[in-house]
Amino acid sequence: MNKQQLAAKIWESANKMRSKIEANEYKDYILGFIFYKFLSETEVTRLHADGMGNEDLEELREDDTETAQYVRDLCGYFISYDNLFSTWVAKKGDFAIANVRDALSAFDRNIDPARKRVFAGIFDTLQTGLSKLGTDEKSRSKAARDLIYLIKDIPMDSRQDYDTLGFIYEYLISNFASNAGKKAGEFYTPSEVSQLMSEIVAWHLAGREEINIYDPTSGSGSLLIHIGQAVARRNGNPNDIRYYAQELKENTYNLTRMNLVMRGILPDNIVARNGDTLKSDWPWFDTDETKDETYEPLFVDAVVSNPPYSQNWEPPEAGEDIRFEYGIAPKSKADYAFLLHDLYHLRDDGIMTIVLPHGVLFRGGEEGTIRRNLVENHHIQAIIGLPANIFFGTGIPTIVMVLRKHRDDDHVLIVDASKYFTKEGKNNKLRASDIKRIVDAVTGNRDVDKFSRLVGIDEIRQNDYNLNIPRYVDSSDNAESWDVYSTMFGGIPKRDIDALSKYWTVFPGLRRCLFAEENGHSAKLAVQDVREAVNADSDVKAYIQRYREAFIDYPAYMRGELVGNAANVSIAAEEETLTNDLLRRLAGIPLVDAYAAYQVLDDSWQKTISIDLETIQAEGHDAVRKVDANMVVKKKGGKDVEVPDGWVGHILPFDLVQGKFLTSDLAEIATFESRLSEIGGEIADILENLDEDDKSSTDAVSEDGDSFVAAELKKAVKSIGKNPETDFDRALVSAQRLFDEEREVKKNVKNLRSALDEKTRTVIEGLSDEHADDLLAAKWVEPLQRKLEELPQTAVDELIAAVNALNDKYSTTYSDVCEQIEQAEAELGNMLDQLTGNEFDMAGIAELKTLLGGE
């Protein structure tokens, strides 16, 4: 399985196994076990690399103080052989929950003092939660054993496996967050929001060699990790990044540390604290005893945070805390307290991004004072309005604010991205194209109609420092207007046609082709079929041809970039390379939305290409020639068990291979399947032509008359014999003959499909390198090319729809409507004349006729 499939399998099983345990609690248990597995296997891997064999591992004991110290120096901790995760797995039925308790207690005793800050107490949440896994030792042991067997297949012993492990960890955190309810989901910042913030930060920090980043409300640590990954992609060496994190809740603080360690971040680059960020600021010192000599305030290159919204806090007196020189946030709303804390800890050339509730933009009182100070001192670089319902557990509108410690620009970029998202389950989600659209606007200080605007400080002053986004950016759809003249007399107003000017610029002759001017005010449609006329236009054809020429060598380029370089391509950096090439091809081609094109590329990259590249780089090019047993879940002994059912390609889908190499086999199957369809139709015809009395007279037809009853039909035909006498008998015999044929055809199809699967398996396993590469190109490049080729036609189709909509809008005039009303009233009046009734009925009818305009 690839990492996506493995993560989904683990989540599905874990969600079933947690039973009545709250998702937020169960999260801590499974993630704790995953982390323990990681530490165990990291120790084993490092000892193997240092020359220790498996037999030597069995001698790892805590009372061997010299070896224990050697391992602590090597790893930062020591785990004895009896307490290794692999030993737990090997115990099988002999494993007990006591093994876990003993191991976790021993771990705390065996941490290298220099690594206490990273590892001390990291399993406390798991340790205290073990009792909730069951009602007694037996049930707890079974629950823990099930968890261990569930996660034992997660790979953790190579650089690629850090990505797999991290992906699974993030996948589980995300799914637990989405199932955890209103408050419990707040520990997690959705990865798309993290990515948005990280791209902005990474852009600002590009080119720096050593970087310190800080999250004062770190939650799961995912936001910090995204920032680090984005910075490392631009700057090269991930080990040049130092991570500072602070988190109030102990279980979430442990989650932060686990997540950072499991991403392969060096322990020396992790500095995490469990504490109240607002109460206990970060004066840095080695120990309490030496704090007077070693005190050093923390200043970093970037601060990122998603603090709890509108949190209660205990504000200090004015002037007591240097962090809050711009003002003291209200006691019931700590949002600006977190912001000012973040800003204080920036270096002079640093940048920060923070998620806040929308209310911070316009609430008054002390918050208004803080906002004024931030604006007047040029700290706010950008305000990004996010879609509603994008965070787990809350649907309130949120923003990302981008601030700098020092900047000369007195403008603020206001971005309204509230309409750019896709729906996913209960929540809204930013797409890759939405993130890129926002990042491009922020990093380029772009004015984009109905999306972003660079606002001067004078305008903000005039609005009394109210930064509410709709004051500056109107993202609403234009209200539909109706032309009075055209409504009365028909015709399409010229101004409505002028509004499509972006199309007429590209297709200069098309307007004259589509419209014939009636007077100086309006025009009428000059063609019967708009689609046919537009697609036949020479300018439109030239436009589509120009687009195709820009992509004529795209398959060859993509094949060279990806297929020919699959073993060495940098998966982390390659998408940006492909994006730059795509945007270069689109430059100068109007109407096509570059962000739509980017989304097509990103979908292909994320869902297919990068996954396959990871597999090839981890397993070698022979992975392309591998097939796997197709595992399906079936009931066995009342339980769901996985059993093999045929084969699937490890990388290459069977249908792709069959479509390229086994077309005659597919054609033969298609012939039989076509016959199956015909048989179904013939049986339906027989049933439809049966007399209702005949249907009700036999058990061979179901009570509702919609189908034959197989067993009863067989009995009836047997009793009819070889010489049916009536049309009804002959119909039953024909139906049985068709059912017999259908059974044989289905059997043939099943056998042919089974044989085809075996042939496909043989073909895949015997592929030459050239054919393997051809199939990779067919899987990766051809679908992408097809979707990109659809984009110019999509732009043309939008014009066709707009022209048809204009024509429909004014095709019926007001006088036409009045005439239709009069006609309907007259028809109704005539029908009323034919009614009879008592004197009261007739009086009512007469009054209705008067209202309708009758006599």
Can you name each region flagged by the protein language model?
Residues 1-201, 268-277, 385-388, 412-418, ...:
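Non-catalytic, mostly N-terminal accessory regions of nucleic-acid modification and defense proteins
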Residues 5, 9-10, 16, 22-38, ...:
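Conserved Class I SAM-dependent methyltransferase catalytic core
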Residues 137, 158, 217, 245-249, ...:
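Hydrophobic alpha-helical scaffolding
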Residues 183-305, 310-314, 320-327, 337, ...:
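Conserved S-adenosyl-L-methionine
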Residues 299-300, 333-335, 349-351, 377-381, ...:
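Active-site lining segments that contact anionic ligands and/or coordinate catalytic metals
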Residues 314-334, 358-366, 387-392, 425-427, ...:
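Short, contiguous acidic/charged loop-to-helix segments that flank catalytic cores in large enzymes
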Residues 398-442:
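Conserved P-loop NTPase
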